[in-house]
């Protein structure tokens, strides 16, 4: 769970875990920013049930969290169960544009990291990864 590491400087020992007690989240970046008057929002293309995020996100300061299927484009990815990142970028952008005052938006990407499924690529906006230039580096090409 990257958000634990990046926002709270914590490490999960397993992906099958219970996170309580929740006092360890008091030093998470979103909690500290809320105390400074920031409006906090979080976005993730998967279900809130994935890793039970619906239970512990509020404790780390991510009370206003948006999960699948509550987006304007809920077309499923091929690589992961949920909305592809390119399908929710408009929701994230709209939240940023409509922010009043200080705002912090945390977007946990779903499918723009390894492994990449060619079925989730945008076609015209990607390179021809079969060119000799990318020989043996097709995954890197699709980044």
PLM region descriptions:
Residues 1-143:
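Solvent-exposed soluble domains appended to multi-pass membrane proteins
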């Amino acid at each position: 769970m990257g958000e634990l590491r990046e926002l709270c400087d914590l490490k999960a020992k397993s992906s099958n875990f219970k996170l309580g007690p929740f006092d360890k989240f008091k030093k998470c970046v979103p909690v500290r920013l809320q105390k400074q008057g920031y409006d906090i929002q979080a976005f993730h293309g998967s279900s809130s049930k994935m890793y039970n995020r619906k239970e512990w996100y509020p404790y780390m300061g991510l009370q206003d969290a948006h999960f699948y299927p509550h987006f304007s484009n809920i077309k499923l990815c091929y690589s992961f169960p949920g909305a592809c990142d390119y399908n929710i970028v408009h929701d994230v952008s709209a939240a940023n544009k409509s922010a009043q005052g200080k705002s912090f938006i945390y977007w946990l990407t779903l499918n723009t990291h390894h492994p990449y499924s060619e079925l989730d690529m945008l076609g015209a906006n990607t390179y021809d990864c079969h060119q000799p230039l990318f020989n043996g580096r097709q995954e890197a090409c699709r980044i």
